[in-house]
Amino acid sequence: MRGLKDELLKAIWHAFTALDLDRSGKVSKSQLKVLSHNLCTVLKVPHDPVALEEHFRDDDEGPVSNQGYMPYLNKFILEKVQDNFDKIEFNRMCWTLCVKKNLTKSPLLITEDDAFKVWVIFNFLSEDKYPLIIVPEEIEYLLKKLTEAMGGGWQQEQFEHYKINFDDNKDGLSAWELIELIGNGQFSKGMDRQTVSMAINEVFNELILDVLKQGYMMKKGHKRKNWTERWFVLKPNIISYYVSEDLKDKKGDILLDENCCVESLPDKDGKKCLFLIKCFDKTFEISASDKKKKQEWIQAIYSTIHLLKLGSPPPHKEARQRRKELRRKLLAEQEELERQMKELQAANENKQQELESVRKKLEEAASRAADEEKKRLQTQVELQTRFSTELEREKLIRQQMEEQVAQKSSELEQYLQRVRELEDMYLKLQEALEDERQARQDEETVRKLQARLLEEESSKRAELEKWHLEQQQAIQTTEAEKQELEQQRVMKEQALQEAMAQLEQLELERKQALEQYEGVKKKLEMATHMTKSWKDKVAHHEGLIRLIEPGSKNPHLITNWGPAAFTQAELEEREKSWKEKKTTE
C-alpha cells in the first residue's frame, strides 16, 4: 500500500499545485473541499466534509492552512484507499485540474489524450521527491521504449547531443517539459501522428495498465465448443478477453495464480498452434495465429505464473525499482566522491598555502644566505689577511721555539740523568731505613726478653726468701717437730738448690740477652749513621736538580750550586715528609 500511496500522491501533487495560483503552498478551503470530494469519489472512499472543517477550524479566513492539507489527505483519504478504483479515472480527474494551467500553447504532434498518457507515464517514472522531475536516465528509457514501439532505430548519438545541451542547473524535466519534448517530434522524425500515438498507447498499456502482452487469438467455448476470435490482454494476475481491441465489450477473465499452468497441445480438429491454460476450476483451450505467437504467449503466461509464485512485481516495475536503486547508489558514490574531492581540494589548498609559505621562507632564507655569503666572503678575506700575518709570526715564534727546544733538550737530558741518580739514592736510602727499622725491632725484642728474665729472677728471689723465712721459722719449732721439719728442710734444700741452679741459668741467659742487646744497639747505631749519610747525599744531589720551566719573577732559593730547582714551600713540604717518616720508624 505504501507504493500505491506514493503513486497517488504524485498525481494529487499536480492537482494541488495547479490550485495554488500564487505558489505560496496554500489553497483556499473551498477549493480543497472540491478536491477532497473529487478524490473520495474516484478513489471510492467515503467522504466526510465535517472532518475537513474540523481539521481546518483554526483558520476560516483566506487560504489554508496552519496544519496543512497533507495530514488530512493521509488520514482521511489515502489510508482508506483500496485497490478497487479506476486508475485511469483517478489520473484523468487530476489531469483535468492541472492541464489547462500547465500544458504548452505551442502546437504539438500528439493529441491531448496522448499528452495525458505521457503525463501518467511521467508520474510512474519520476523520482520520489518534490517538485517532481524525470531524470535523463528515465527519459532515455522512455524514448527507447517509444522508438521500439514505433519500429524505428534508437539514435544514441542524438540523445547524447541532447544531454550535452541539457541545462546544468536542472536535474531533469518536469511533466510538461517531457510532454513538449515528445510532442515536438524531436525523437520521432519521419513518423506520422498515428504511429506516435500507437507507440505512446503501447508504452502506456505496459507501464501503467500492467499489460504484459495483448493480441487476437481463437478461444474454444466451454458450452458450445465452438471457436471464437477474441482480443486477449495479459496482466500480472489475470487474462481478460474482449470482442475487439477497443476493449468495450469484455467477454470474460482467466484468473491466474501460482497453481495455474500452461501447456502446449498438438494440432487437432483442423486447429493449429494450440495451447492449454489450466486453472483451479476451468481449463482454457486457445489457438494462436502462428507458431511464433503461440510460443510468445506460452512464455509470457509462464513468466507471469512464475512471478506470482515468487511474489515479485511486474518486470517493468521491478526494472524501475532497480534503476532507482542504482541511481541512489551512484548518487551516494558521487556524493562520496564529491566529498573526497572537496577534502582533497581543501588539502590541496592547504598544501598550496604551505608551499607558498615555504616559498616565501625559502626566498627569505635565500636573501639571508646571500647576505651571509657576502659577509662570509668579506670575513674570509679579513681572516686570510690576518691568517697570513699570524702565520708569519707563528713561523718566527716556531723558529725561536725550536732553538729553545734544542737548548732545553740538552738541559732536560742532564736533568733526567740527575733524576735517575736521585732515584737510585732514594732506593738505597729506603733500604737503609728498612735496616734501621729491622734493628729497632730486634732491639725491642731483646729488651722485652731481658725484662721478662729480670721479672722471673725477682720472682725466684722472692720465693727463695720466703722459703728461707719458713726454714728459720721451722728451726724455732718444737723438738717434736724438728725431725719432721728437718726432712722438710732437706727437701726444701734440694728445691732451693734446684731454684739456685735455675737462677744461675736465668742469670746466664740474662747476660747473653744483654750481649745480644749490645750487638743490636751497635747495629742500630751503624744503621742510623748510614741513614744520616744517605740523607746528606740525597740533599746534596737534590740541590743539583732544577726543573726546566719558564722564568719567574718570584725570588729563588740559592744553593751552593746556584739557584734552587724548588721553592721554599716545596722544601718545607719535603722536610715535613722526612720528619714524619723518621717519627714513624
Curated annotation (Swiss-Prot):
It comes from the Eukaryota. It is found in: Cytoplasm; Cell membrane; Nucleus; Cell projection, Lamellipodium. Tyrosine-phosphorylated. Residues 351-373 have a biased composition (Basic and acidic residues). Keywords: Cell membrane, Cell projection, Coiled coil, Cytoplasm, Cytoskeleton, DNA-binding, Membrane, Nucleus, Phosphoprotein. One of its GO terms (molecular function) is DNA binding. InterPro entries: EF-hand-dom_pair (IPR011992), PH-like_dom_sf (IPR011993), PH_domain (IPR001849). Its main location: cytoplasm. Gene3D superfamilies: Pleckstrin-homology domain (PH domain)/Phosphotyrosine-binding domain (PTB). CDD domains: PH_SWAP-70 (cd13273). SMART domains: PH. Residues 210-306 form the PH domain. Residues 347-373 are annotated as: Disordered. The keyword Cytoplasm applies. It holds the Pfam family PH. Spleen. Expressed only in B-cells that have been induced to switch to various Ig isotypes. Residues 316-529 form a coiled coil. GO terms for biological process: actin filament bundle assembly; isotype switching; negative regulation of actin filament depolymerization; negative regulation of cell-cell adhesion mediated by integrin; positive regulation of actin filament bundle assembly; positive regulation of cytosolic calcium ion concentration; positive regulation of mast cell chemotaxis; regulation of actin polymerization or depolymerization. One of its GO terms (cellular component) is postsynapse. The PH domain is essential for phosphatidylinositol 3,4,5-trisphosphate binding. The SWAP complex consists of NPM1, NCL, PARP1 and SWAP70. Phosphatidylinositol 3,4,5-trisphosphate-dependent guanine nucleotide exchange factor (GEF) which, independently of RAS, transduces signals from tyrosine kinase receptors to RAC. It also mediates signaling of membrane ruffling. Regulates the actin cytoskeleton as an effector or adapter protein in response to agonist stimulated phosphatidylinositol (3,4)-bisphosphate production and cell protrusion. PANTHER family: SWAP-70 RECOMBINASE (PTHR14383), SWITCH-ASSOCIATED PROTEIN 70 (PTHR14383:SF6). This is Switch-associated protein 70. The gene is Swap70.
